[in-house]
Amino acid sequence: MRAVAPIGAFATPDNFSAPVGSKLVGAAFEARAQEFLQRQRLRFVARNVACRGGEIDLVMRERDGALVFVEVRARAQRRYGGAAASIGWRKQQRIVRAAQHYLATRSSQLRDQPACRFDVIAFEAGRLVWLRDAFRADEV
């Protein structure tokens, strides 16, 4: 399922060329993605979960208890396939590895193994695009 929203308050072209560096620009887009998902009634769990093999930008929880691991990408233009297309097979593997690490290190806090989903929030060409269930762990 794909949800598209005009960026409007989410971003301006200045965010793509800010002299403060890509880490701060990335953090700003992650914050905007988090705000968007919370308005969609997902609950914030964690941000920038890292392990040796990868990182997850956002961990959210659906109302039904499912954990949603979110990759946030931003591109000023849609050339070369846009932001979502930049998440290739290797990046998907790293995200899945980080999610497995996250679940393993928090198994004592989780009563049962929750259902999990991998989503992408892409900011591209003036729009926010939400790709629910963008890829599956068993496909990478």
Curated annotation (Swiss-Prot):
GO terms for molecular function: nucleic acid binding. It comes from Paraburkholderia xenovorans (strain LB400). Belongs to the UPF0102 family. Pfam families: UPF0102. This is UPF0102 protein Bxeno_A0149. InterPro entries: Restrct_endonuc-II-like, tRNA_endonuc-like_dom_sf, UPF0102_YraN-like.
